[in-house]
């Protein structure tokens, strides 16, 4: 998720105040502008995101993985732990890259109707935890995500996102000569993975 500053309205008010006044009032307005603190890029939204690792490009998709505090959702996805039960919320931010143009997407467009599953495997363990991601919207737009409880606790994990194309009965592509796209959806899930994700517990 991208952070959104809540300080914009204060800055706009100060600017209007300084523009309307004259002389000493104008100077006072400039002082007000100077007093408005600059947004903190890391904390402007009131929370911090933590990357799972570097973003990945797989096929026509640019995939980012981040986590932060558990969230409340409505309606609540049935298979996910609640905000109170979960350790964190994990997001897959999936947008089209340059290759996505062949499917009719613009670079940076959110790609809808995907089926995204995460697999978490702690180093040294044979157990693989499967997490079904759901499409959802936050204040900054759509993503795929889930509240997650790490079943094997703190440690280093391999994290794997498997991203299946939209199902044939839910999403179609134009393929005629006049209006069609040149690309086709992938037949096997695309994979974005990180081998050394360190889960240290809540950092917020």
From Swiss-Prot:
Q: Which InterPro entries match?
A: Metal-bd_Tp34-typ, Tp34-type_sf
Q: Which domain of life is it from?
A: Bacteria
Where is this protein found?
Cell membrane
Query: Which keywords does the record carry?
Result: Cell membrane, Lipoprotein, Membrane, Palmitate, Signal
What membrane topology was assigned to this protein in its record? Lipid-anchor
Using the record, list the residue span of the signal peptide; answer none if the entry has no such feature.
Answer: 1-19
Q: Where is the lipid attached (N-palmitoyl cysteine)?
A: 20
Quick one: a GO cellular component term?
A: plasma membrane
**Pfam families of this UniProt entry?**
Iron_transport
| Disulphide bonds in the chain | none
S-diacylglycerol cysteine-type lipidated residues: 20
UniProt similarity note: Belongs to the UPF0423 family.
Please give the function described in this protein's UniProt entry: This antigen is a pathogen-specific membrane immunogen.
| Protein name listed in UniProt | 34 kDa membrane antigen
Q: Which organism is it from?
A: Treponema pallidum (strain Nichols)
């Amino acid at each position: 998720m991208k952070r959104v500053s809540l300080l914009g309205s204060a800055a706009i008010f100060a600017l209007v105040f300084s523009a309307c006044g004259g002389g000493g009032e104008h100077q006072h307005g400039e002082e007000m502008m100077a007093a408005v603190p600059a947004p903190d890029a890391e904390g402007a939204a009131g929370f911090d995101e933590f990357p799972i690792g570097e973003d990945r490009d797989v096929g026509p998709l640019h995939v980012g993985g981040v986590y932060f505090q558990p969230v409340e959702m409505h309606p609540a996805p049935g298979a996910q732990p609640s905000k109170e039960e979960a350790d964190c919320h994990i997001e897959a931010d999936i947008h089209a890259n340059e290759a996505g143009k062949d499917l009719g997407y613009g670079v940076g467009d959110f790609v809808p109707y995907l089926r995204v599953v995460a697999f978490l495997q702690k180093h040294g363990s044979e157990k693989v935890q499967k997490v079904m991601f759901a499409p959802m919207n936050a204040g900054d737009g759509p993503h795929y995500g889930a509240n997650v409880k790490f079943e094997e606790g703190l440690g280093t994990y391999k994290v794997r996102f498997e991203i299946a194309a939209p199902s044939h009965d839910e999403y179609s592509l134009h393929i005629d000569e006049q209006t069609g796209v040149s690309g086709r959806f992938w037949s096997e899930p695309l994979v974005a993975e990180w081998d050394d994700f360190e889960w240290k517990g809540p950092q917020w």
